[in-house]
Amino acid sequence: MASKCLKASFSSGSLKSPGKAGGGSTRVSNMYSSSSCKLPSPSRGARSFSVCSAGLGRGNYRVSSCLPALCLPTGGFATSYGTGGGWFGEGILTGNEKETMQSLNDRLASYLEKVRQLEQENASLESRIREWCEQQVPYMCPDYQSYFRTMEELQKKTLCSKAENARLVVQIDNAKLAADDFRTKYETEVSLRQLVEADINGLRRILDDLTLCKADLEAQVESLKEELLCLKKNHEEEVNSLRCQLGDRLNVEVDAAPPVDLNRVLDEMRCQYETLVENNRRDAEDWYDTQTEELNQQVVSSSEQLQSCQSDIIELRRTVNSLEIELQAQQSMRDALDSTLAETEGRYSSQLAQMQCMIGNVESQLGEIRADLERQNQEYQVLLDVRARLECEINTYRGLLESEDSKLPCNPCAPDYSSSKSCLPCLPAVSCSTGAARTTCSPRPVCVPCPGGRF
């Protein structure tokens, strides 16, 4: 922050004196330009003090100072003494003071050069840091939007493929269920056919048994008929033989029981046997009918039980198939979720690794920046020490200048010159603060050396 101070510029055009080289008229002009006086901040500010001397020959002797520590008109003070013919006699300052001022000026120039060099290095470091940050920005913040869009499209395609696969799996499972239903129906029909065939075979065996019984009964009837015929034949033979025997005898009528009618007896026996056969046949038919009814009832009950069991089995199979389908769907969903979880973990692990790398890079950069800040703080402390020393030297300079100004005569060329008179000093200087009033130096004559070398 540049400080604005009162400036007093004393420019000397030419001093004319007879008999001297480059003689001419002597002209002194004073110019005062005032502005506000502002104290700079402790951290920065323009502080310069330089002495340039061209020796005793032709040239200029200029003393410039900028002392923002005090609210003096010499905050930007420039005084020049110029003569067309050069200086006559000795200079204002002695040899030791000139050497001291020259050494101070050299040290100040070296300090300023060092400060300028440090500022240039700081600017170069800032530019390098800025360039490095600009170069590192693409690596620190890469653009993954295209990859994310591609991943989203692939995920959508994968989800569509998974949905299509699940639909096909459901269709296949439905076809398997239909095939299982048809298989169970076929097996049921086959079992019913086998049961009917077994019943038919059983009834055939019963029919064969009944046929055998009928054949036995018919054989018994035939044997009984043959026996009856034999008995009839024997009876006729006996009757004939008896008649033949009775024909030769007398006819003796004997009051006896009436003779037995064999035909009637045979008819009665025949009727008895026929009734017995009919009863046996009826009993066999009744037994067969009862057995058949019982078997039919058992078959019906067993078929009903079988149908109920088969329906229960079909329902259980459907339930099992639906549970298997649901289990497969849950397993496929679990596999999809596991794959999605693995992909998400891999993606986030890669992003975490990238973030950790970025954090490591940023931490390393932060460490470098902190090291640079520490170094700059150290340099700043060194510069503060240098500034303090420069302020001390500037105060020393100011004391020397004030002592020299007090030694200079007000008008050495005047006839009523008195060595006791001196230049009027400036008003008391007060430090520039917020509450203090600012004061300016009153105009005073410029002290220049006389042409005759009186001073």
UniProtKB/Swiss-Prot annotation:
UniProt entry keywords in alphabetical sequence: Coiled coil, Intermediate filament, Keratin
Region ranges (Tail): 405-455
Alphabetized Pfam families for the sequence: Filament
Stretch list, region Coil 1B: 144-244
Domain IF rod: 97-408
Region (Linker 12): 245-260
Region (Head): 1-97
GO-annotated molecular function: structural molecule activity
Lineage: superkingdom: Eukaryota
Family: Belongs to the intermediate filament family.
Other known facts: There are two types of hair/microfibrillar keratin, I (acidic) and II (neutral to basic).
This protein's name: Keratin, type I cuticular Ha5
Native source species: Mus musculus (Mouse)
